Swiss-Prot record:
GO cellular component, one term: cytoplasm
Name used for this protein in its record: 2-dehydro-3-deoxyphosphooctonate aldolase
Enzyme class: transferase
Provenance organism: Azoarcus sp. (strain BH72)
Subcellular location, principal: cytoplasm
Catalytic activity: D-arabinose 5-phosphate + phosphoenolpyruvate + H2O = 3-deoxy-alpha-D-manno-2-octulosonate-8-phosphate + phosphate
Gene Ontology molecular function: any one: 3-deoxy-8-phosphooctulonate synthase activity
Taxonomic superkingdom: Bacteria
Membership in a protein family: Belongs to the KdsA family.
Location(s) in or outside the cell: Cytoplasm
Keyword field: Cytoplasm, Lipopolysaccharide biosynthesis, Transferase
Gene Ontology process terms (BP): keto-3-deoxy-D-manno-octulosonic acid biosynthetic process
């Protein structure tokens, strides 16, 4: 699959989707996008910048949601033009899709909406690549049904990715079953692993989600060792001050060290081949 000018797949270098959970300001958007661009160029990892103009599924109605679609898309458009990086953002309703698709390079669907048939049809038919997040409530094998819906809408175009972000495990907890990455390959789509939302503790702080940031490298290393096309990681210059998902965001100053390790694992695994394909 060609994505934003580079090839993705199990026989291609791992790529990265990264940025702050939500757009907090124009200055921070440019700071993080510029830093990530430089880091990924140095490490040798293709990069797509991610940030959201609206977080429609916050734990509390009083939590910061974002700058709104108009201001947020203006910032993403400027990041794309001035820094020369592809951009991704998520959409939460059918009505938003045309305006978002006119600006960004890749659209993303929230995990909670992965079974909404009309929504999946609309996103998939917009003409842009789509990263479909697997719901925390969904078995990995059931993503085939989601992908089938998307392909019905886009005429079978090769522009759909599927993303694992953990599975609900009791209350306020998620776990990552690494078998799901192999199972989701059966959709025929590139598989992306979300290493930061997978350590989230949904609603774990009462009016906000908690997280176990210390396990981001653990799960990221494991996923790359399994074999994935891409990684998704939310990052922030100072996660303690982040306006959304700070507890599970990976610190921007520590991103280079983590990506260097993941790059080495990815090269080793993909150079040896995947034995499970012969089992």
């Amino acid at each position: 699959m060609n994505l934003c000018g580079f090839e993705v797949g199990l026989d291609k270098p791992v790529f990265l989707i990264a940025g702050p959970c939500v757009i907090e300001s124009r200055e921070m958007a440019f700071e993080t996008a510029g830093a990530l661009k430089d880091i990924c160029a140095e490490v040798g990892i293709p990069f797509i910048y991610k940030s959201s103009y609206d977080k429609a599924n916050r734990s509390s109605g009083k939590s910061y949601r974002g700058m709104g679609m108009e201001k947020g898309l203006d910032i993403l458009a400027d990041v794309k033009k001035q820094l020369g990086v592809p951009v991704l953002t998520d959409v939460h309703s059918i009505e938003e899709i045309p305006a978002v698709a006119a600006v960004v390079d890749v659209l993303q669907t929230p995990a909670f909406l992965c079974r909404q048939t009309d929504f999946i049809h609309a996103v998939a038919s917009c003409g842009r690549p789509v990263n479909i997040k697997k719901g925390q409530f969904l078995a990995p094998g059931d993503m085939k049904n989601v992908v089938d819906k998307a392909r019905e809408a886009n005429g079978g175009a090769d522009n759909i990715m599927v993303c694992e972000r953990g599975a609900s495990f009791g209350y306020n907890n998620l776990v990552s079953d690494m078998r799901s990455l192999a199972i989701m390959r059966e959709t025929g789509c590139p598989v992306v692993f979300d290493a930061t939302h997978s350590v989230q503790l949904p609603g774990g702080q009462g009016t906000a989600s908690g997280g176990q940031r210390e396990f981001v490298p653990v799960l990221a290393r494991a996923a790359v060792a399994v074999g994935v096309a891409g990684l998704f990681m939310e990052t922030h210059p100072n996660p303690a001050q982040a306006l959304s998902d700070g507890p599970n965001a990976w610190p921007l100053p520590r991103m280079k060290a983590l990506l260097s390790t993941l790059k080495a694992i990815d090269e080793l695994v993909k150079s040896r081949g995947l034995l499970e394909t012969e089992a």
